[in-house]
A protein has these predicted regions:
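Short, flexible loop segments at boundaries between secondary-structure elements
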Residues: 248-282
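Mid-to-C-terminal catalytic subdomains of enzymes
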Residues: 7, 11-20, 37, 229, ...
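Phosphate/ATP-binding catalytic cores across multiple sugar-kinase/actin-like superfamilies
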Residues: 107-131, 220-224, 341-349, 471-479
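Conserved glycine-rich, hydrophobic/aromatic-active-site segments
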Residues: 119, 213-214, 260, 281-406, ...
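Acidic, carboxylate-rich catalytic segments that either coordinate divalent cations
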Residues: 436-481
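Cysteine-centered catalytic environments shared across enzyme families
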Residues: 1-193, 198, 203
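Extended catalytic-interface subdomain
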Residues: 207-208, 230-241, 279-288
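ATP-dependent adenylate-handling ligase core
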Residues: 159-221, 235-256, 376-384
Length: 481
């Protein structure tokens, strides 16, 4: 187990041994084994990184939850010094994409071949791969490849709640392809117990909104004899991310205001998700509104810590501002922002969980041959439709060679976990963690007590889930050696 002390500055009497890890599926498998070596140097909790987690659900790279462990994620040079000279460059600029229209080449056939190769390579060391299968536009091409290359793949689908039911589409895809298919219905208490069972082995910390569902799935896979998880993340960066009118409007509303706390606690507002979401948006930085999920406001984060710290977290955006400022439009800016968030958010949840459960994690869409071909060779109109603004045109055409229009591709909800159920079932447990970690977050218990009656609103329940993830990790990893 890794011991830890608190750190509020870069100055300390005994310097802990510094570690730097290349952590991105685009770079290959990350090596977390070196984290055990930092025990001798008394690694310390980076409190600004903790503020990152509470404000955004992830730690701004190249930082990690530990102040002497830096992460070279995609966009950074893994051979560079992440302590003294980190420099972020987005690798899939629009300027590098092919501008001419479709020339009649067999784009679908080439895409299928490269995807099958990517699937085969990424799962080569797995004896029993399990594919996270939603029946949507990312996981369905992987299922098509699996049926051809690794028919021993098992598909598994998570039923997280009423808002986002992927089961029908996923079952149809798996059955038509002849793949075994399993369904895991969300039980928030079970998922949380599974997280607590592995939290001591989680090498670092993220608070991605899908972490608990991922842990639930990965534990089921492990208990069922699977030795690897196949994840459909990674294609958004190079296919592109079209920004719709709603998200442009929300970014425009993000003004970085400091609003009084009582507004979100008024009876009319406090129980209304949409109004709470709108109020929180007004208090965000425009870039940070792009990041998914509902999080603590800056004022709430300062209250949780009992001192001003949110501005130090927000200041970490400065590292990315020059690259953001050079974006040619909202789509490219969104892709840049999501690359930053996904590195230590979406990707991290899988990498950390797989490490804790001794599973292999595969990300076929991050394969260098596949991604470079799509980015540099496929025409723009096959990435994003210039008229309809439909995303991943080539991927959809690939799916259409086997299936008609899949329901989950056209209708997508917002939450994949029963957040309100978690708050209802595990409030006392999380409150106890808040009391045990009050030296780190002295305001956490008070926030829980004040908002207990509002946790049937998924806006407040989302914040509860952040504390539910963060507090046990702090409690476990901050014990003396």
């Amino acid at each position: 187990m890794m011991g830890m002390e608190l750190s509020t500055s870069g100055t300390r009497k005994i310097a802990a041994r510094r570690r730097q890890i290349a952590m991105s599926p685009y770079f290959g498998k990350p090596d977390f084994s070196g984290l055990g070596e930092v025990d001798a140097g008394r690694p310390k909790l980076d409190q600004v990184s903790l503020a990152d987690l509470l404000r955004n659900g992830f730690v701004y790279p190249p930082h990690s939850i530990l102040d002497n462990v830096k992460l070279a994620t995609f966009g950074f040079n893994p051979k560079g010094d992440m302590y003294s000279a980190p420099e972020f460059r987005f690798s899939f600029r629009d300027s590098g994409k092919r501008k001419d229209a479709d020339t009649g080449q067999d784009w679908i056939g080439t895409y299928h071949r490269l995807l099958c190769d990517a699937y085969s390579k990424s799962c080569a060391e797995m004896k029993s791969p399990w594919l996270l299968q939603s029946g949507g536009k990312d996981s369905t091409p992987l299922a098509i490849a699996a049926a051809e290359i690794r028919p021993d793949t098992t598909c598994i689908t998570y039923l997280g709640g009423n808002e986002e039911n992927e089961v029908g589409s996923a079952c149809y895809v798996a059955q038509k392809l002849g793949l075994r298919h399993e369904i895991l219905v969300c039980d928030p208490g079970r998922a949380y117990d599974r997280y607590l069972a592995i939290v001591e082995r989680m090498p670092l910390l993220t608070a991605d909104f899908a972490l608990l569902s991922y842990v639930d799935l990965a534990t089921t896979i492990s208990e069922s004899g699977g030795d690897g998880v196949v994840d459909g993340m990674g294609s958004d960066n190079y296919f592109g991310t079209p920004v719709d009118r709603q998200h442009r409007w929300l970014s425009a509303l993000a003004r970085g205001l400091r609003l009084p706390r009582f507004l979100s606690e008024l009876p009319v507002i406090g129980r209304n998700f949409e109004l709470c979401y709108l109020l929180s948006t007004l208090q965000m930085h425009p870039i940070e509104r792009v990041f998914p999920g509902s999080r603590f406001t800056d004022a709430e984060v300062d209250e949780l810590f009992g001192r001003d710290i949110a501005e130090q977290s927000k200041a970490r955006l400065a590292l990315f501002q020059s690259e953001f400022a050079s974006a040619t439009g909202p789509d490219e800016l969104c892709a840049m922002a999501l690359t930053v968030a996904g590195a230590t958010g979406g990707f991290a949840k899988g990498l950390f969980t797989a490490s804790a459960l001794s599973l292999r994690a595969a990300y076929p869409f991050c394969d260098p041959d596949l991604r470079e071909w799509v980015y540099r060779q496929v025409p723009l109109d096959q990435l994003i439709d210039p008229v309809t603004r439909t995303s991943k045109v080539l991927m959809r055409k690939h799916i259409a060679t086997r299936f008609g229009e899949l329901p989950y591709i056209t209708r997508k909800g917002s939450f994949r976990f029963d957040l309100c159920g978690l708050a209802r079932d595990r409030f006392e447990q999380v409150h106890a963690y808040a009391l045990r970690t009050r030296k780190v977050l002295p305001g956490a218990a008070r926030w829980l007590e004040r908002n207990r009656d509002r946790l049937d609103n998924k806006y407040h329940a989302s914040k509860f889930s952040l504390l539910a993830v963060v507090l046990p990790w702090i409690d476990t990893h901050s014990r003396p050696l």
